[in-house]
A protein has these predicted regions:
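Left-handed beta-helix
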Residues: 1-221
Length: 221
């Protein structure tokens, strides 16, 4: 009471409304690609601010003609350009994918760090950051860390597109392929450290700029 008595409080009842909880990438993907139908009464749609499709869901994303997007993907705040191909069930967030192939059932999440550099975090849609697994395999193949959250496996790069390539190389390494020497010599960060070092002002500006592009594209369709 000592802390709150000076403030007025008001109860607002929103209608129509629904409480929606999701805590994992897999749950987010399911919500946006399938469960969204249950919230039609809230005017929710699979595609908002972007080219509509019955195959995938998006929110504030630009997908150029010529790109192939697999079934049940979720794209947010991203550009998919040129001849890119995105595998089924992939989740893209805050990335630019230009003429690249994104594997199925992975998440690519881009961040600009406060020092102006970029990192793209790649992981399996079903991965649990609290566990020592990566893309469904033991994390020990890459190094000794207690969990994916703490694992310093994500290269820090000068540009976002370089960071996308580094993330795809990391995916290849987990599959026994890729350029391990390039990964080992790169400065790397973790999910935890990159989260704490994210440039939030840049993220908001990125989303606003992309929103303008998506709106302009919609007018030209």
């Amino acid at each position: 009471w000592d802390a709150l008595h000076a403030f007025r409080m008001r109860l607002l009842r929103l209608s129509p409304a629904a409480f929606i909880h999701f805590g994992t990438t897999r749950e987010l993907r399911a919500l946006m690609t399938e469960d969204v139908k249950q919230y039609a009464f809230l005017d929710w749609k699979r595609c908002v601010l972007g080219r509509a499709s019955e195959r995938y869901a998006l929110n504030n994303a630009v997908v150029e003609h010529g790109c192939e997007i697999g079934a049940d993907c979720y794209l947010e705040d991203s550009y998919v350009l040129e001849q890119s191909r995105v595998g089924a069930g992939a989740v893209l967030s805050h990335v630019t994918v230009r003429d690249r192939e994104v594997p199925a059932d992975v998440a690519l999440h881009g961040l600009r760090l406060c020092d102006g550099r970029f990192v793209v975090r790649v992981y399996g849609a079903g991965d649990n950051p609290k566990e020592a697994t990566f893309l469904g395999e033991p994390l020990a193949r890459l190094g000794e860390w207690p969990s994916l959250w703490e694992a310093e496996i994500y290269p820090v790069c000068g540009t976002l597109e370089q960071a996308v390539d580094a993330a795809l190389n990391l995916y290849a390494l987990a599959r026994g392929e890729g350029d391990r020497a390039a990964w080992e010599t790169a400065e790397r960060t973790s999910l935890r450290a990159s989260f704490n070092a994210a440039d939030t002002r840049f993220i908001l500006d990125w989303e606003a700029s992309l929103r303008e592009t998506a709106q302009a594209e919609a007018l030209l369709e």
